[in-house]
Every structure is written in C-alpha cells, then in structure tokens.
Amino acid sequence: MRKFLIKVGLILTAAAGLFIWFRNDASVLAGVHPLGMIDRSGWVAANSHNPDVLNTLESANTGVLFVEIPWEKVEKNPGAFSWQFENDYGSVDLTQLFSRLQRHGIEPVAVLSGGPMYLSHLYPQQPVFRDQLLESLQRFAGAAAEQFGSDVQYWQIGTAINNKEAWGKVLFPLADNALAEPDPILYSEMLRNAYSAIKEYDSRSTILMGGLEFPADCAYHPSNYLQAVADQDAWYAFDIASLSLPTLASSPETATFDACGIMPSTLSGVPSADSVQAVADALNGIGKKPLWVGNLQFSAPELVQEANTHSTIPEAIASDWLARASALLRAFGSADRVIWSLDPLNNTPGLLALQTYANLSTMISGRFAGSTLPDSTDAYALRFRGGGKVNLLAWYTQGGLTANAMIINGMEGYAPVAYSADSDSLKPKDGITLPVDDGGNIALMVSERPVLISGHPKDIKQTISQAVADSTAQASDGMKAKLSHWLQAQKAKAAIKVSDWAAKQQASLLDTLRVSLEKWIRKSLGLA
C-alpha cells in the first residue's frame, strides 16, 4: 500500500509540474474548449454594459466570442483610430467590451473586417490601390494589437475572404452591394502584413485565416483557396484556419452545403461533416493546422416544421440539433472548435440550447475516440476521451420523442452515468447510473433527443494514469503545432532576409555599374 501511495504521489507531482509548465504557455493547451460563439449581429457588443448579457454567456461557459472590428468605422482618416462607434443596436466601446469579456472568462476573437474607406476607389472600375491597402492594413492591425493586446489573444484577418460580396467590401469600402472576385494572392500579402504587425507586438498572439465559406464558384472552394495561399508562401502567416457555414436547412445528419461535391479520403456518411473533413484533409496535406468551424445555426422555418411534426417547441429541436451537429463536426469533420451563431434577439441559441452548450463544452472537449454504433443505420454513439474519462453523445435520427433501446459496448472498467443533453446539472447524483454487464455493455433508452454519458474509471489508479496520459497527449499535440508554426515563421523570416540581402546586393551592383558607366561616358567625351 505504501509503495502504491508513493507512486501515486510521484505521478501527482509530475502532473502538477507539467500543469505549471503548460500554464506558463497557454497555447500549448489551446483547443481544450471545443465550442465558441460569434456575435455576428453585433448585439452583444452594443449591450456588454448590461451585466445580464455577459453573466449569461459566462454561465454557458462560452469559451471564445468572435467580435468584429469594422475597419471603416474605427479608422475614417489615415492613422486616426477611434475604438468607439455606433452599430444597429447602440454604442460599442471595444476597449470596455474586450476587458469585460476577459473578466467573465471569455476569450475575445477580434475580427478585422471591411476595408479602408479613406483610400481612393471607384466602383466597379478602380478598387483601392494594392500598395496603399497593404500599408494601411499593417497600420490598422498594429494599432489594434497595441490597443487591445492585453485582452485579445486571437485575431482573425478578414471575413468570408472567398466570398465576392465580402471581398467587395474590402476593395470598395464605400460602395453599396459591391462585388469583387476573391484574390488569394492579395489576401496572402494582407495576411503576411497583419501577421507581422500583430506578432511584433505580441509573438504569442494567434492568427486566424478569415472565415472561408463554401461558395458556388468551385475555383474559390476552401480547399483551393488554402492551396493558393500556400503557393504564395504565406502558410506561416496564420495559426488556425476558420470556416463559416451557411444556415443549415435540415437535420445535422442530412444537411448539405457544398455545391462542389469535394469529398474527403474517408467518408462518414454525414454530408456536412464530410464537406468539412475534405477541407481538413487539404489543410493537413499542405501543413497541419487547427480548424475552427463557425456560424453553426439552423433555419428557423425548418425548426418550426420539425417541432410541429414531433409536438414539441422549436427551441427544443434547435438545442438537440446543435448538440448533434457539434458532435458530428468534431468527430467526423476534424473540427477543433465548433462556433455557434449568437443572435439573442432571434432567440439563437435559446435557453435550452445554452444549457446544452454548457454541458457539451466539457463533455465533448476530449479527443474523438471512435464511434460506438449500435446495429442500426439511424443511431449514433460518439465517444470522446479526455481528463481521464470517456464521454459519449448518443441519439437516434428517427422516431421523434419515442425512446428505443440502445446497446453501447466498450464500457468495461467504467462507471457510466447518463444525462439529457440539456440537463441542469452534470453531478452524478442528478444522472442515471448505468450498470455495465460482463461484456462491457450498457443499455439505455434513447430517442432523437441526445443523451450524454459520462464514464469515470472505477479504479483510482486508472483514473490518475488516464488523466496524465490524456493531458500529455493533448500537450504533445499543442507543442507539435507550436513547433511547426515557429519553424514556418523562421523559414519565412529567413526568406525575407535573403530577399532583402539580394535586393541590397542588386542595388549595390546597379550603383557600381552606374558609376562605371558615367566614368566611361565622361572619358569617351573627353570630360574626365
């Protein structure tokens, strides 16, 4: 017993040491929280002074919140920045907003959007001049980093960068309904400039490539756009790739949105997840980086129709579908984070969904550990492992609210407890303890409403060893990503230095030739 206690003590000491080390570099452990939200309408930004707003988001364990910094509103004249502006819902004070978010445990993601309104342009003949745009963006990004760097770690450069309307707002900031062909070459230059400006202020900052969508024009498909950025040697200039989904118009298992039909190397049978996985495959094929998938929401009319079919309320359907979609994108789409659309005025997400969000933020935060599928094509039981335990999200895709038996295997050595996805509490006493048979199986009743299952190892030694193993694996992934980013940045810096050296040598050579030519001319003319 004494030897066991000594071993446990050593393990705990080592774990504590690792924890302290990792805490000194939080980016190593980045990605623990699997979800986030985006304040697309700007309502939260204009109402952050109301304590109830951020208290609600804090209670939901929001994690990260995307907030736009509209270029045309904060820099109306070159170099004159005002971090307060008006939007459709009131006054926004970005300094106060980011500070408040941090105090509520929410990491802001500052999204640099729009274009410089003060640069000369005329739609559609003349966009803003390229060199002026690049110079202005570097100034804008640097000023924002200096102003908010103590509160903002994450920076997204642009929004919907492969969308003609969004790109039109960059090149023709003052034109209404401007359209412009997306330009990954120009965006790559913008990305490099913003990266250098922000990293110069704080090298620990995390840069996101801005919100790739799934367009109808396959030339600008996220996979093709990523390759174009890589071809411009700008792969080092971002740390995370972000996707922006359209509003989904059917259930999570059937929703489709990629008109180009680009498929991943391995199909899951879930169209939405397969479309995202295809982008993840492209991302990893070029150079592995995390993938955040944003703007998750469902069509309001579809939610109403589904609710009427099953004699329930749209908020309940939304809560269930958001949970199922989040798990599917994490499991089969390789999404490191799934970002929900936040629109409080339209009850998105509703109170039920917010509770579900809070539960999922801890229950699907681990690594995807496989799918325990019962003997049915309409059933899912997705397994996530982290923190020394195994969590599952299980549901049927048919049958409505009628519960049917489900058998899940692989639970030997665990003490599983089941909860509804929107349960008010995840304490064991508030769940249903599930007995494990001799074959490691558990049985429970499940409907289209997803069920959370949390399994802790029965043995304390196994609990400790699994917790350490999970934390080490997570930290290892973080360190590999961090090392990869650092190496890419060093290569880029070296290339820039070589380019600068070559330019200087070329200038020196040209100057020497010019002087020699002048001497020869003067000598030929008898002027020497």
Describe each PLM feature range:
Residues 293-364, 368-377:
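Aromatic/acidic polysaccharide-binding cleft in carbohydrate-active enzymes
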Residues 1-13:
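N-terminal Sec-pathway targeting helices
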Residues 432-474:
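C-terminal beta-strand-rich structural cap/linker in extracellular carbohydrate-active enzymes
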Residues 183-319, 332:
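Noncatalytic carbohydrate-binding groove/subsite architecture in carbohydrate-active enzymes
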Residues 47-58, 134-144, 220-232, 318-326:
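Short, acidic/polar
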Residues 60-80, 89-219, 242-251:
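Substrate-binding cleft and catalytic face of glycoside hydrolase catalytic domains
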Residues 24-70:
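Boundary/entry segment of secreted carbohydrate-active catalytic domains
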Residues 375-419:
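Carbohydrate-binding surface patches
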